[in-house]
Design a protein with these regions (language model features):
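Catalytic Walker B motif of ABC-type/P-loop ATPase nucleotide-binding domains
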Residues: 148-152
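Conserved ABC ATPase "signature" region
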Residues: 105-119
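Q-loop/switch helix immediately C-terminal to the Walker
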Residues: 82, 87-103
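Helix-to-loop junction immediately C-terminal to a conserved catalytic motif
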Residues: 48
C-alpha cells in the first residue's frame, strides 16, 4: 500500500532520521513514537507528500508518489496536530466544506459518533479545544479514504473520546483501511495489527 525507502530528513542542519524504511499494508496501523523533536511530524508530512526528504522515495501502490500524487491525495485523509477547522463556522458548515456531497443525516450521525449531537449549528468559537478537536476527527466517520495519516489525534481528548477514536481506528483496519499516527499516549491493546516505529537516539528509526 504505502512504502518509504531510505528516507533521510535534515532540518536546520540537524539530521532527524536517516536511511529510514517502512511499509504499511492494508488493514494495518503504524504508531510513530519518539521524543519531541525526533522528527515524527516531519516524517508524516513527507509520507503525505507535503514535504520533501533529503533523500529517499515514498511509493503508493508500487508507484513513486511524484507520479501518482493526485490519485494518492484522493485516497488519503491527513489530519495535522492542529484541528484545521474554521472557528467562525459552525460544526456542520465545517463538515460541509470538507465533504460537500455529504447529506445532513450523515453529518449529524458523524457528530453524534464523537459525542457532539446537538452541536451542529454552534460556531466552533464557542466550543472547547477538545470539542473542536472532535469536530476535526468527525471527518474519520465521513471519509472513504483507505489511508489515514494522523498527527497526535488524541490531543485534547477526554477518556471517552479517546476510546471512541480507538474503536474507529480498529473498525477502519478491519474494513481493510490503514493508518499511521503519532501519539504521546500509550494505546490500549487493539483488536487489529499494530506496529510501532520509534524515532530518535541515533537519528534513525526502527520498527
Amino acid at each position: 500500500m504505502l512504502h518509504a525507502e531510505q528516507l533521510t530528513c535534515i532540518v536546520d542542519d540537524r539530521p532527524l532520521f536517516a536511511a529510514l524504511t517502512l511499509s504499511l499494508a492494508a488493514g494495518e496501523l503504524l504508531q510513530v513514537a519518539g521524543d519531541n523533536g525526533a522528527g515524527k511530524t516531519s516524517l508524516l508530512r513527507i509520507l503525505c507528500g507535503l514535504a520533501r526528504p533529503e533523500s529517499g522515495v515514498v511509493s503508493w501502490q508500487g508507484q513513486p508518489l511524484a507520479k501518482v500524487r493526485e490519485s494518492f491525495h484522493r485516497q488519503l485523509l491527513w489530519l495535522g496536530h492542529k484541528p484545521g477547522v474554521n472557528a467562525a463556522l459552525t460544526a456542520d458548515e465545517n463538515l460541509r466544506f470538507f465533504f460537500p456531497s455529504s447529506r445532513l443525516q450523515q453529518r449529524e450521525s458523524a457528530l453524534a459518533a464523537v459525542g457532539l449531537a446537538g452541536y451542529e449549528d454552534l460556531p466552533l468559537s464557542q466550543l472547547s479545544a477538545g470539542q473542536q478537536r472532535r469536530v476535526a476527527l468527525t471527518r474519520l466517520w465521513l471519509t472513504d479514504a483507505p489511508l489515514w495519516i494522523l498527527d497526535e489525534p488524541f490531543t485534547a481528548l477526554d477518556a471517552t473520546a479517546m476510546e471512541t477514536l480507538t474503536r474507529r481506528l480498529e473498525q477502519h483496519a478491519r474494513q481493510g483501511g490503514s493508518a499511521i499516527l503519532t501519539t504521546h499516549q500509550p494505546l490500549r491493546p487493539l483488536r487489529c495489527p499494530l506496529r510501532t516505529l520509534r524515532l530518535g537516539g541515533d537519528a534513525g528509526g526502527g520498527q
